[in-house]
Design a protein with these regions (language model features):
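Serine-hydrolase catalytic core recognition
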Residues: 2-250
């Protein structure tokens, strides 16, 4: 059978495995036995068929992320991927601004330990001295139902708290400019972005929001009511989850 192997810092590899084994018993001996043993060892570890990296792959040429995480006050581990600037120096006098990339929808993790070919946007941040962070809240799926169930009938509530916890941790780092933290997201991430700007402007100074839902009573029912119940049964949940409720006092 064929399987793939990768992680956030390792390009995808295509490997061949086999459950069948060449004989290593008394029926074979000498060079045949040694050859069979070598072949079986290869099949145990996987025979490399293709390597996305290529022979000239040099990880130092790319802006690769590192895994980071925080633990909330109530015990949820929240994972993230942080990409540092190319000229990063944790001891430098000059500090770095931070760009958060968020989503926040239930059971939709953005942080995955898998290879993503570095794109132009990520490289732009790295070349321009900006720390780039992709982070997830408790409801993204990494904490199972214990985290996901907390989003039921109260979308955005715990997600916003978790992203604020992320920002609080990040701005405490000695090499971060606490007054230059921005956030960006699309779809549910657009909703999250505007909510963060309205509810936590002391943490997030600017944002770019696209395609968000700003009043859940106007969105499609098959998604909304799966997580929020109906507006008639959950009026308070819909009120709190509406960007308009928070934007009026912004």
């Amino acid at each position: 059978f064929v399987a793939t192997l990768d992680n956030a810092r390792t390009p995808t590899r295509l490997l061949l495995f086999s459950s069948e084994r060449l004989p290593e018993d008394a029926s074979v001996r000498g060079k045949t036995l040694e050859r069979n043993r070598r072949r079986n060892a290869q099949l145990n570890q996987g025979v490399l068929l293709r390597d996305m990296a290529g022979e000239d792959y040099d990880p130092s040429r790319y802006c690769l992320p590192q895994e980071v995480s925080i633990v909330t006050e109530d015990g949820f581990r929240l994972p993230g991927l942080m990409t540092l600037p190319l000229d990063f120096d944790s001891t430098a006098v000059a500090k770095y601004p931070v760009h958060f990339e968020v989503y926040g929808g239930p059971d939709t993790p953005y942080v995955r330990d898998r290879w993503r070919t570095p794109g132009e946007a990520g490289r732009w941040f790295a070349e321009n001295g900006i720390i780039h962070l992709v982070v997830d809240p408790r409801s993204a799926g990494h904490n199972g139902r214990a985290g996901e169930d907390m989003a039921y009938r109260q979308l955005t509530v715990w997600e916003i708290r978790d992203y604020v916890a992320w920002a609080g941790r990040v701005r405490s780092l000695p090499y971060v400019r606490a007054d230059r933290i921005g956030v960006e997201g699309f779809s549910f991430g657009g909703t999250t972005t505007v909510m963060l700007l309205c509810q936590a402007p002391e943490y997030f100074r600017c944002g770019i929001a696209g395609g968000g839902v700003y009043d859940w009573t106007l969105y499609d029912t098959h998604y909304t009511e799966r997580f929020m119940d109906t507006p008639q049964n959950n009026p308070e949940g819909y009120r709190v989850a509406s960007v308009l409720e928070w934007a009026k006092d912004y």
